[in-house]
Amino acid sequence: MPKAIMYFPAGFLWGSATAAYCVEGASPASDWSEWGQQPEGVLDESKPGRACEWWSGRWREDFDRAQETHQTALRLSVEWARVQPEPDRWDEPALDRYREMLIGLNQRGISPLVCLHHNTNPLWFANEGGWENEQAPVYFAEYARRVVEALKAYCALWVTFSAPNAYAL
């Protein structure tokens, strides 16, 4: 059987991806964190918790591993519930932490790619009807504007939604 030779263009991004809910730990009040606490939420009744402890600083270890394996990009998400825990409250220290992560990637020669929404919603947003609320686009646009404004100096690549069809179905 002949071997296939694949060529990738110069500048092709090799990397990996994460989701805030899956790696950060210390989960804020989101629809997923609430669901995970329900007895019927997970088959074996395990509960969400520390995850990979990125929020406590272990992201540095993973970024070092990405650098050691010559990755050139890393997609991470910003946890909306962490940045905007209540409709009229913004957590600036949380944005500072995400900024620190993006700086860490850039210092390692890794291009950050930020996903603004990776499946989870703030609990206040879910309690107001989530994406079925006619104000949902307004809420999300304000969140996105604030995050992009805070992080744009450290990130050139953005994804609005991870798997948007999950909500459409």
Please give the residue ranges for each predicted region.
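Substrate-binding cleft and catalytic face of glycoside hydrolase catalytic domains
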Residues: 24-25, 61-169
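N-terminal carbohydrate-binding accessory modules
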Residues: 1-71
